[in-house]
Amino acid sequence: MEVTVLIPNYNGLKFLYDCIDCLKKQSIKDFRILVVDNASADESVKWLKENNIDTLVLDKNYGFAGGVNAGIKEVDTAYTILLNNDTKADVYYVENLLKAIKTEEKVFSVSPMMIQAQDNNRIDDAGDGLCIIGFAYQIGVGESIKRYEKKMKVFAACAGAAIYDTALLKELGAFDEAHFAYLEDVDLGYRARLYGYKNLYEPSAKVIHIGSATSGSKYNDFKVKLAARNNIYLHYKNQPLLQLIINALPIALGMFIKFLFFAKKGFLKAYIEGIKEGFASYKKCKRVDFKKVKLSTLIIIEFELIINMFKFVLHFIKRRIDRLY
C-alpha cells in the first residue's frame, strides 16, 4: 500500500457518502481511507462507524491544520492525499496523482484539476499562486477547464485534494497549526519551495469541488479575519528580513486594495481585526531556518512573486472573458 487518503471532516455528514463512494470506485483499490473528525456535532462519526470507515475522532475542533496534522501522524504510507469532504473524485484520481508525484525528483506535492460543482466546465483550482502584493490565489478559478489541460509547476498545491510525499510532509513540520484554517497550504508549499522542492499541477487527476462547505460561504467574518491574520503569518515565516523590507510597499498596497474590497463587501471590521491579530501574534509562528535556504532560491522565488502579479491580473482578465461565453 503506497497511499493514504486523508479526509478532514467537521459536520460534513451530507457530503461524506458521495466523497467516499467515489473513492471506493477508484481504478486502483490498494489505498487506505482515513477520516479525521474535528468533533462534529452532526452524526458524521456514527455514519462512519456504521460503514466501517477508518476514523480518528478528535476531542474538539482543531481546524483544518490541526485536524490534518493529527491524521498525518497516523499515516505510514509513502504518500498522503488530502481530500476535502465536499469533493467527488474522478475514477482515475488516485492513480493519476500517484503517477504524477513519481515522474520527477524532488516533488513535494501535486495538485489535481479541481472543477467547480456548479459548472463542470470551469476550474475551481489548478494549484495555488502567491504574488508580490501578498495575494494568494486559486490558479484558474472561474476559467474554462480547456485552458488547464497541461501539466505545470505551481507555487503551492491546494490541500483540498493534493498528494504529498509523506516523509517530506513530516520533515517540513506539516501544517502550521497557528493558522487553524486558510492559507496553511500556501504556507506549506512556500516552505517546501524554500528548501528546494517542487509543487506540480496534474490535469489528468480530477475532482469536482463544492467549496466553502464547512465555513458556509465564499466570504464571512470568520474566513476574512483568519485569512487576513494568516497572510501576516505567511510573509513573516517565509521571507527573511531584507526581503520583507523590499516587499513592504507592495504588501502594503495589497492590504490597501483588500481594505477597499472588504469595505465594499461589508467585512471591513473582520479584515481589520485579522490584521491586528496577525501583527500582535506573528512571533508565535516558527520561521523558516534561512541558514538552510540558498540565496539563489530566494532570488528565484522573489522574481516568481513579481511574475505572479502579472499572472494574477491575466487570470482576472481571462475569467471575465470566459464569463462572456
Predicted regions, residues:
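Short, acidic, metal-binding catalytic loop of nucleotide-sugar glycosyltransferases
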Residues: 21-30
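A conserved acidic beta->alpha catalytic loop
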Residues: 22, 37-45, 60
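Glycine-rich, basic loop-to-helix element that forms the pyrophosphate-binding segment
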Residues: 58-75, 85
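Short aromatic/hydrophobic "clamp" motif used to bind/position activated sugar donors
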Residues: 80
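Conserved donor NDP-sugar-binding/catalytic core segment of glycosyltransferases
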Residues: 87-130
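A recurrent flexible, glycine/aromatic-enriched loop bordering the glycosyltransferase active site
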Residues: 123-124, 137, 143-164, 186-188, ...
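A short, conserved alpha-helix in the catalytic core of glycosyltransferases
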Residues: 155-206
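Non-catalytic, C-terminal membrane-associated alpha-helical segments of glycosyltransferases
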Residues: 244-325
